[in-house]
Amino acid sequence: MTARPSAPTAVDAVARALRDELDAVRTRAGGSAAPRVLDVGGGSGTWAVPLAAQGCEVTVVDSSANALAVLRSRARDAGVADRVRAVQGDVDALADIADGNGGADLVLGHGLLEYVDDPVAAVRALAGAAAPGSAVSVLVAGRWAAVLGRVVAGRVAEARRLLADPLGRWGAGDPLLRRMDTDEVRALLERDGGLVVEQVRGHRVLADLVPETPDGPSGAADLAALEELAGQTPPLRDLASRIHVVARRPGPR
């Protein structure tokens, strides 16, 4: 994904949702402690380093030693190495990795469910790692955007296979184990994870269809506003490249 430097981008909707949640965490705590964030599959720190820069204590769990090395380097460069903890492991080991502190204030599973062998077990592990009343944020590859993208690229046979496949894959060479639609993600989090879904948004609904930033002083801002609205509006929301869901673990906050 290439950010548009001159104006807010589609990723801002996800980042804003996380900031809102963390502001609520700080308010409940009276500002007495840094929010605890657990980023599962967080790799090189795309989300972890900015969150640490916002004052969070972030633990990143990833199976790749190389990605975690990049994370440590980025955290040092950003001056937040003391607020980022890197742990090599996978979602199956969350129960052993988590501190005995009652769970995280925010759990991220961004770009995770596409790759795990057992998404039900993964979602249950994410839910179990969140403190009661805390949020789980999931970002997963959207099925319908992948179909349309292949049609536009002239890869019609792949689009047909992807549309017909129960897991939303285009073939044996597909690097993803699955893609999902909004109903599938919601059911996975609610039915299998025991979470309460609060927000479902499309992430990059229309922005990827625009070859360049629109002209004019308000062009980029207009695109960002359109993207924000489309991400909340079915059926456009359901055509997004990725689906963002914020769900909450039941319990007192």
Spans of features found by a protein language model:
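Conserved alpha-helix/loop element of class I SAM-dependent methyltransferases that forms part
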Residues: P8-A33
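Conserved class I S-adenosyl-L-methionine
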Residues: A33-G41, A135-A164
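Class I SAM-dependent methyltransferase SAM/SAH-binding core
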Residues: T46, P50-A93
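A conserved beta-strand element that flanks and buttresses the S-adenosyl-L-methionine
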Residues: L108
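A short glycine-rich, Lys/Arg-flanked "PGG" loop and its adjoining helix->strand segment in the class I
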Residues: V120-A135
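Short alpha-helix
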Residues: D174-G193, V200
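Conserved Class I S-adenosyl-L-methionine
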Residues: Q199-R253
